[in-house]
């Protein structure tokens, strides 16, 4: 819940709705979006220029893009299964992580000079925080981590 609330703060900063100062808007937005692993300017470009600029326009809005019956009938079996899963109640999170976050935040770089820097900040935060969580778990409960690693490795062979 806290990460979602912080994301909303970052969203409002990206819309330049919270502060008059662009400096404050950027840094508060950047910090607020880091826990959800979103690069501030990268996300702002995709959200403000592409999504809001082309909301519900077929082939332009990368977030909301319904498929016609004709398009769906031309899909192969794997694409049909993927499409049905992504648009089901269970698939929304997977859809977001793959189609929006991974393809839009990690693979794509917005044509803004700040986008590369923000992506580097976000990816650095992701790797450093993951490493810190691993180290903390090791320091606080080494036997649990070792058991987890051994059991995880053994499960692959069973």
Which residue stretches match the model-derived regions?
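Post-HEXXH active-site segment of zinc metalloproteases
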Residues: 20-35, 63-64
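Non-catalytic, topology-defining segments of multipass membrane proteins
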Residues: 1, 34-150
